[in-house]
Amino acid sequence: GSPPADSGSPPADSGTPPADSGSPPADAGPEDPGINPGWIGGACAGDGDCPFAGGTCLGTAAGWPGGTCTQACDRYCPDQEGDLFTVTFCVEGEAGTGQCVSRCDFTKLEEGCRPGYSCVRRGSYQEPEVTNLVCLPTALVGPGDGPGPCLEEALRLGLSVTPAPSVFDHPEGRPDLTCTVEEPLYLASPVPGANYRYMDAASPARMFMACPLALALHDLGEVLAESGILEVIHMGVYNCRAMRDSDNLSQHALAQAIDFGAFVAGDGTVYSVEHDWESLHGETETEKGAWLQAIAHRMYDDRIFNIILTPDYNAIHYNHFHVDLTPGSHYLGKPGVEVPRFLGTFAEWGDD
């Protein structure tokens, strides 16, 4: 048959089209995770969103995704208390002046920074040799200067760590040997619940070490917490030297070893290696001796450290546990093996 008859004219126009709103909707930028609200490192659309002394907004147009609040600084930046706030740091801004930014925080943000920002290492404005990990716009920073996997894990665990300068030292009289440190950092107390104090110091101080040692101390801290240990008295970490009568570097030369002299519980009980140690194997006569024996075995059994040397090892260790991360090792000391005893001067004995 024939096609349907033409109905005539097209349907009447229902009216004029909606007015053009002009430009497309403004880009709201990355989603704001709600970190640092109204504070340094927080999102902002203008200076009014940064309601603190000297607060200004670095906007999206200037390359800061979602905007970020900042403040001029000469050396230090203020910090805000609360779970929503990160620690700040003073870096050199684009104008060559000091500018407060947020430090990376992997405990609050999966990538350590807000979306659109990267965690990178930068020097302090007045002291460029003092570095820290801060959040800067991804588009404005180059790759390769962020935290390595170990340092990122340390930050994610909540350890108080800051990057440290690389070392390139030689043991005295041994220019053929070089001390290098893997991902050097400073670790501050508590770790995670115990303060670390050098034996001659009146108060805890940050320790220079390789990053893997910081992770090991975190694991040890969880074990020490079971006994209520709040302070660890140590006898040193980094020392660029070779082992005695050897061409091998000590693990102290790699900052992957630490010597423990004593452990102090919250009730004031002191477990001193020098005064309370009895033996690595067999029955002990005192509670303190039993605890020291148990913690030595726990560090070994849990593989917190690869080597644990106690006073049973030799006379050099009469007053401390030496623990380190020697690759491929798993040593504590075996029962039934006669251990060397002190028969001369300490200088005659091998050292760890």
Predicted regions span which residues?
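Ser/Thr-rich, Pro/Gly/Ala-heavy low-complexity intrinsically disordered linkers and tails
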Residues: G1-G38
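Secreted, cysteine-rich disulfide-bonded mini-domains of extracellular proteins
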Residues: G29-P143
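Residues that flank catalytic or metal-binding motifs in active/ligand-binding sites
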Residues: P65, T86, G96, P115, ...
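Surface-exposed patches in mature extracellular/periplasmic domains of secreted proteins
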Residues: C90, V161-H170, G228-V237, Y271, ...
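Active-site acidic/histidine clusters and adjacent loop/turn architecture
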Residues: D145-H234
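Catalytic cores and adjacent binding grooves of peptidoglycan-active enzymes
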Residues: C150, D176-L177, E182-A188, G221, ...
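Mid-length scaffold segments of soluble, non-membrane domains
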Residues: F208-L215, V223-V232, C240-R244, L249-G266
